C-alpha cells in the first residue's frame, strides 16, 4: 500500500472513529459505519480491528463505559441506572458485568473508591491520531491567584486528587467550577519521572485567599509573563503529543527560550460534562 493510499485509508477510519465518538447515544450500525469507510460490511470488522487494535463492538462499548466511568467518579448526582441506560445497557445487571470486566470494579465500588491505577492499566492502547500543524500564539499571561492541591505520586492516580479538589470546590463554594478558571501545572514528565516523585498541581482561580482546610488545598499563584499557547482539542490521553509538538516542532524554529516555570494547562471544559472529542485544553509554555 503506497503512502497516499495508506493515508486515505487511515483518514476514512479516523472519520469513522470521530463519528462514533460524536454519536455514542445513538444506534451505530455496521452498515452505516462501513459505508463511511467506503468498505464492505463483510470486511470492515477486520479492517477496523487491524487498524485500531480493537474489534468494532468492543471499541464502541469501551467508549461508552469510559464515559460512564467519568460520570460515576465526578457526577455524584447521576444515578447508576441512568448511567447504565445512557451507556446502551438495558438493565443495571448487564452494565455491572461489563463495567467490572472493563475496569475491575463494580460501578458502585468505583463510585465509592475508584482504583485509577487499575483503570489506566486496563485502558486499551489504540492507534495514535495523526499529528497536525498547530496554531501557536504568544500571549501575556496575567499573574493568577489560585487555590492549589498538589498531587505527588503515580501519574495514573491524578484523577483521585482531582476528585478531592472538585469535592472541595463544591463543598466550600470557593473557586466555583462554573465561574472560575481551572489549571494543571505539570512539574514532571510522567514518561521520565519515577512514579513516586511525579508532581502535578491542580488549581482553581480565586479572588480572595482561601481558609485553612484538612484537604490540603493551599493558596498559591501562577506567575505572569510571556507564554506560548496552543489549544488542544480532544482526549486528554493525547495531550502529551500536543506538548511535544511545542518542544519538538515549534520551539526550535521560534528562537524563543523557555522560562524557569513548568508547562501548565487551562481546562476550558471537563470530560464528565462534554464528550471527549469536545474537550478543549490550552497548553501554556512560559517564555523569557
From Swiss-Prot:
GO terms for biological process: cellular response to antibiotic. Residues 14-113 form the HTH araC/xylS-type domain. InterPro entries: AraC_E-bd, DNA_gyrase_inhibitor, GyrI-like, Homeodomain-like_sf, HTH_AraC, HTH_AraC-typ_CS, Reg_factor_effector_dom_sf, Tscrpt_reg_AraC-type_HTH. GO terms for molecular function: DNA-binding transcription factor activity; peptide binding; sequence-specific DNA binding. Keywords: DNA-binding, Transcription, Transcription regulation. Residues 111-288 are annotated as: Putative effector binding domain. Residues 31-52, 80-103 bind DNA. It comes from the Bacteria. It holds the Pfam family GyrI-like. Homodimer. Probable transcription factor. Binds the peptide antibiotic albicidin with sub-micromolar affinity. Duplication of the STM3175 gene increases tolerance of albicidin. This is Probable HTH-type transcriptional regulator STM3175.
Amino acid at each position: 500500500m503506497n503512502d497516499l493510499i495508506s493515508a486515505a485509508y487511515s483518514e476514512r477510519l479516523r472519520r469513522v472513529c470521530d463519528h462514533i465518538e460524536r454519536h455514542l447515544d445513538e444506534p451505530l450500525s455496521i452498515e452505516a459505519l462501513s459505508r463511511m469507510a467506503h468498505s464492505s460490511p463483510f470486511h470492515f470488522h477486520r479492517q477496523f480491528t487491524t487498524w485500531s487494535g480493537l474489534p468494532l463492538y468492543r471499541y464502541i462499548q469501551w467508549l461508552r463505559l469510559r464515559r460512564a466511568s467519568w460520570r460515576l467518579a465526578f457526577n455524584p448526582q447521576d444515578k447508576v441506572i441512568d448511567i447504565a441506560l445512557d451507556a446502551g445497557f438495558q438493565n443495571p445487571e448487564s452494565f455491572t458485568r461489563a463495567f467490572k470486566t472493563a475496569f475491575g470494579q463494580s460501578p458502585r465500588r468505583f463510585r465509592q473508591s475508584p482504583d485509577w491505577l487499575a483503570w489506566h492499566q486496563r485502558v486499551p492502547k489504540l492507534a495514535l491520531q495523526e499529528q497536525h500543524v498547530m496554531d501557536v500564539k504568544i500571549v501575556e499571561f496575567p499573574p493568577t491567584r489560585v487555590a492549589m492541591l498538589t498531587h505527588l505520586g503515580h501519574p495514573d492516580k491524578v484523577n483521585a486528587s482531582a476528585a478531592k479538589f472538585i469535592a472541595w470546590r463544591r463543598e466550600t463554594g470557593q473557586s466555583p467550577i462554573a465561574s472560575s478558571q481551572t489549571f494543571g501545572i505539570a512539574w514532571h514528565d510522567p514518561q521520565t519521572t519515577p512514579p513516586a516523585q511525579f508532581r502535578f498541581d491542580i488549581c482553581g482561580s480565586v479572588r480572595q485567599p482561601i481558609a485553612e482546610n484538612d484537604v490540603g488545598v493551599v493558596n498559591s499563584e501562577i506567575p505572569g509573563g510571556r507564554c506560548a499557547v496552543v489549544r488542544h482539542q480532544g482526549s486528554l490521553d493525547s495531550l502529551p503529543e500536543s506538548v511535544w509538538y511545542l518542544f519538538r516542532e515549534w520551539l526550535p524554529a521560534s528562537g524563543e527560550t523557555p522560562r524557569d516555570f513548568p508547562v501548565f494547562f487551562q481546562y476550558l471544559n471537563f470530560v464528565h460534562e462534554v464528550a471527549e472529542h469536545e474537550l478543549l485544553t490550552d497548553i501554556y509554555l512560559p517564555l523569557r
